């Protein structure tokens, strides 16, 4: 089987996305690679496809347990034998997994960077053929990155202890030129193929709101996006609790996530979000890295993040499936002071000397200034982000850059009028924030501004907008079926099939194996597992429609 056969058989795709094939070919030719690709561009396939074509094992160094579980779960569902080794497993489970790996059962093993330093894992690694080491979230290796992890610095020493140097591939979605240079140097990549597909996420609409009544804004937004999944980020636990309580009191289906909750609560709440039981989560920035939920339709920042890197990473959790989604930042000057406090009172890193820590604090304050400038710019928000990462977008129109997809480039009078109603807390309604869903609906009726707001007139389209009314009904039926299957097999719904795959089913209406395998995202293993039950659901839906028409 060649690379195209692997792509179709396991992952259900007929062709590679831009940039993927170049990196796959480089790896198969034995070259090191560095892929800097935006979230949702398909970085994982760049190493997963060649891993299945090489003779040995591919080790994927990954920073988060949740990310490993998601990736391994998705691979297993696709028919790929993969495993993860991290602290969530017992010693017995780790011993068993490594024994299976020695027997050749696993082609891909995800491992935490700390695990590379243990004698047991090194002993395993020196007795098996390792074809490639993939460094995921590679920006974690740089002290200049926003997510520096000292354990990443030990990857190269691990490589040097192996009998034969494997191919090294590294991937990240966010890397300034300084971080990129660190990745190349610290991992000692040899004549690497470097691919930057660009940081632009054209499916994301960026908005900055200078408003004071943030609670009313969020409440109205969620009321008008009841069917959508989203994340609301807050800077503090206190704000998470406040926003969660307000939304919950108004009858909205939300959950919460922050470090103050017990491990059991965090897992339960995270699962509620991932499994679409609670479509919206209110969280601190501790939430999200490693969450591969593809159908997040909006990310709202209740507070301004500390830097553009953090903002773009967090906002980038919207629209991973490539469908239109919104990223809204609610700015207030108080956010600057909160972030300065966090920077100046950050816990010292014992792995960095005092002089270096002082330099990093200066850098963090510069990053904060850049974040504030983003919130205050009157120019294109997308252009600001791209230039920050060293990319200059094409401007064929000349003059001021216009992306036609941010709040500074698209002036919506109805949206501006709606925003004016949120300028002063308490100005918009005579009563305080409503305490139940009925009152929320009444507020929406009574507020002309809200009725005309961009939530109803937004230019961004929902994925299912490609469908007619019956198609949307079928899409919702298939989503419900997907949720039931996901719960029964214990994986997130998007691991079964993405929204994009379900929409393609609704458009193609498959009734046999050949037709189902033509649906984007349906590989042979997924067809064997779920093809018939989804085709039966489609048939039952259409049969019901026919009977209704016959009456």
What is each stretch, according to the model?
Residues 26, 301, 374, 504-505:
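Short alpha-helical segment immediately N-terminal to, or the first helix within
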Residues 66:
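Conserved Rossmann-like nucleotide-cofactor binding loop
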Residues 1-10, 14, 18, 22-44, ...:
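Helicase motor core with emphasis on the C-terminal RecA-like subdomain
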Residues 1-3, 337-338, 347-356, 363-365, ...:
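Accessory DNA-binding and partner-docking regions appended to nucleic-acid-acting proteins
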Residues 20-23, 371, 502:
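Short alpha-helical "packing" element that flanks the helix-turn-helix/winged-helix DNA-binding module
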């Amino acid at each position: 089987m060649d690379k195209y056969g692997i792509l179709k058989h396991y992952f259900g795709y007929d062709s590679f996305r831009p940039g993927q094939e170049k990196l796959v070919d480089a790896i198969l030719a034995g070259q090191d690679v560095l892929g800097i690709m935006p979230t949702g561009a398909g970085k994982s396939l760049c190493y997963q496809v060649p891993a299945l074509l090489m003779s040995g094992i591919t080790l994927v160094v990954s920073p988060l347990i949740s990310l490993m579980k998601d990736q391994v779960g998705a691979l297993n569902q696709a028919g790929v034998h993969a495993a993860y080794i991290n602290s969530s497993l017992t010693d017995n489970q780790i011993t068993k997994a490594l024994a299976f790996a020695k027997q050749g059962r696993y082609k891909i093993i995800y491992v935490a960077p700390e695990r590379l330093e243990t004698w047991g894992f090194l002993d395993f690694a020196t007795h098996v053929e390792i074809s490639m080491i993939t460094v995921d979230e590679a920006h974690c290796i740089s002290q200049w990155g926003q997510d520096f992890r000292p354990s990443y610095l030990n990857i190269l020493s691990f490589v040097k202890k192996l009998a034969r140097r494997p191919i090294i591939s590294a991937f990240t979605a966010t890397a300034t030129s300084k971080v990129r240079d660190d990745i190349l140097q610290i991992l000692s990549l040899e004549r690497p193929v470097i691919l930057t597909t660009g940081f632009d996420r054209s499916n994301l609409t960026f908005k900055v709101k200078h408003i004071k009544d943030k609670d009313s804004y969020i409440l109205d937004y969620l009321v008008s996006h009841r069917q959508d999944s989203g994340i609301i980020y807050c800077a503090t636990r206190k704000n998470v609790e406040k926003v969660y309580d307000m939304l919950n009191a108004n009858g909205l289906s939300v959950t919460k996530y922050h470090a103050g909750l017990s491990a059991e609560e965090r897992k339960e709440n995270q699962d509620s979000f991932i499994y679409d039981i609670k479509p919206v989560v209110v969280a601190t920035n501790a939430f999200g890295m490693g969450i591969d939920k593809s159908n997040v339709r909006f990310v709202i920042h209740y507070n301004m993040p500390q830097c553009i890197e953090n903002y773009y990473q967090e906002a980038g959790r919207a629209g991973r499936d490539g469908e239109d989604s919104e990223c809204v930042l609610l700015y207030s000057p108080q956010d600057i002071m909160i972030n300065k406090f966090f920077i100046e009172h950050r816990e010292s890193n014992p792995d960095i000397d005092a002089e270096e820590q002082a330099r990093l604090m200066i850098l963090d304050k510069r990053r904060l200034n850049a974040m504030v400038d983003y919130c205050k710019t009157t120019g294109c928000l997308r252009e600001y982000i791209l230039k920050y990462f060293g990319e200059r977008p094409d401007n064929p129109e000349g003059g001021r850059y216009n992306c036609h997809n941010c709040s500074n480039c698209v002036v919506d009078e109805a949206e501006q009028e709606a925003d004016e109603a949120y300028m002063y807390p308490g100005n918009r309604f005579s009563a305080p924030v409503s305490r139940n869903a009925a009152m929320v609906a009444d507020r929406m009726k009574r507020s002309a501004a809200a009725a005309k707001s961009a939530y109803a007139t937004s230019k961004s389209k929902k994925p299912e907008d490609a469908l007619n009314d019956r198609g949307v009904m079928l899409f919702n039926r298939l989503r419900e079926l997907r949720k039931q299957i996901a719960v029964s097999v214990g994986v997130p719904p998007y691991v079964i099939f993405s929204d994009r795959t379900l929409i393609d089913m609704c458009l193609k209406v498959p009734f046999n194996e050949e037709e189902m395998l033509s649906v984007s995202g349906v590989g042979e293993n997924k067809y064997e597992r779920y093809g018939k039950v989804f085709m039966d659901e489609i048939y039952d839906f259409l049969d019901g429609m026919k009977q209704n028409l016959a009456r």
